[in-house]
């Protein structure tokens, strides 16, 4: 799973996920399913934000990479991926500037057009169950919730999906592709139900005895097929800016 994550996701996404896990004392090399889940969630947050701007009239517009957008303001502020101290600093700044209510939990994004924080969810289960879990945890009508699944389903607060259909379809397609790539490598079942996978692995190890004449070393080389996986497609200009901003914050 670790090799898959490093080949499948943008290097900046992988780096931010590693830093987030280490901040909580978790090891990406051991908790590989969580590593994959965090990378997926980060990618969805970035894709949610990509190419969405606010023009001088305060209207939301979509500008593709390469178009002049120096005078445009990004519609979404990305909070997810920052260390906790910096993330709360950003949240406090937004609240002081806009007057919105401060959330009890760190949200993932802030929407400058709708003036609300957004909690993004990516689930391997049914969307309505995960939505209710998020809502019960947050317990705030001020934070907008938007849940995506790997099967193409989604659910949002008051059925307000924020983004246009094409932007949401791009996210759904990416999630479905991740699922298909995992399944083709036999990783999907353990990703969906990691506890059962661990129990089955322990059971298999107890039943198996070492066989004479069989190789005992495991190859860690990346297969040629895995090397062909393209990383996440992202606005290259914003990727560079985000990398500089996020990593600068991490060093402080």
Curated annotation (Swiss-Prot):
GO molecular function (one): RNA binding
UniProt cross-references to InterPro entries, sorted A to Z: PA/PA-X, PA/PA-X_sf
Locations listed in the record: Host cytoplasm; Host nucleus
Site-annotated residues for Important for efficient shutoff activity: 202-203, 206
Site (Important for efficient shutoff activity and nuclear localization) location in chain: 195, 198-199
Catalytic residue list: 80, 108
Keywords attached to this entry: Decay of host mRNAs by virus, Eukaryotic host gene expression shutoff by virus, Host cytoplasm, Host gene expression shutoff by virus, Host mRNA suppression by virus, Host nucleus, Host-virus interaction
One GO-annotated biological process of the protein: viral translational frameshifting
Coiled-coil regions listed in the entry: none
Pfam family, one: Flu_PA
Source organism, top-level taxon: Viruses
Its biological purpose: Plays a major role in the shutoff of the host protein expression by cleaving mRNAs probably via an endonuclease activity. This host shutoff allows the virus to escape from the host antiviral response. Hijacks host RNA splicing machinery to selectively target host RNAs containing introns for destruction. This may explain the preferential degradation of RNAs that have undergone co- or post-transcriptional processing.
Membership in a protein family: Belongs to the influenza viruses PA-X family.
Entry's free-text remark on domains: The probable endonuclease active site in the N-terminus and the basic amino acid cluster in the C-terminus are important for the shutoff activity. The C-terminus acts as a nuclear localization signal. The C-terminus is recruited to host protein complexes involved in nuclear Pol II RNA processing.
Protein name, per record: Protein PA-X
Phylogenetic placement of the source organism: Viruses, Riboviria, Orthornavirae, Negarnaviricota, Polyploviricotina
């Amino acid at each position: 799973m670790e090799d898959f994550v490093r080949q499948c996701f943008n290097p900046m996404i992988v780096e931010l996920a590693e830093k987030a896990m280490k901040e909580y004392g978790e090891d990406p090399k051991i908790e590989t399913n969580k590593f994959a889940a965090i990378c997926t969630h980060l990618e969805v947050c970035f894709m949610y934000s990509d190419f969405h701007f606010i023009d001088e009239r305060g209207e939301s517009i979509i500008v593709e990479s390469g178009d002049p957008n120096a005078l445009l303001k990004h519609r979404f502020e990305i909070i997810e991926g920052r260390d906790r101290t910096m993330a709360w600093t950003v949240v406090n700044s937004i609240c002081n500037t806009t007057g919105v209510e401060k959330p009890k939990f760190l949200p993932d994004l802030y929407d400058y057009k709708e003036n609300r924080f957004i909690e993004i969810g990516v689930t391997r289960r049914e969307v309505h169950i995960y939505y209710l879990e998020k809502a019960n945890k947050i317990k705030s009508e001020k934070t907008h919730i938007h849940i995506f699944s790997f099967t193409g389903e989604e659910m949002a607060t008051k059925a307000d999906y924020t983004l246009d259909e094409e932007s949401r379809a791009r996210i759904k397609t990416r999630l479905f592709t991740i699922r298909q790539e995992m399944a083709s490598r036999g990783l999907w079942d353990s990703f969906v139900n990691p506890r059962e996978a661990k129990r089955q692995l322990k059971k298999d190890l107890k039943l198996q005895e070492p066989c004479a004449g069989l190789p005992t070393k495991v190859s860690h080389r990346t297969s040629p097929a895995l090397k062909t996986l393209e990383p996440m497609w992202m606005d290259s200009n914003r990727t560079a800016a985000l990398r500089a901003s996020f990593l600068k914050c991490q060093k402080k």
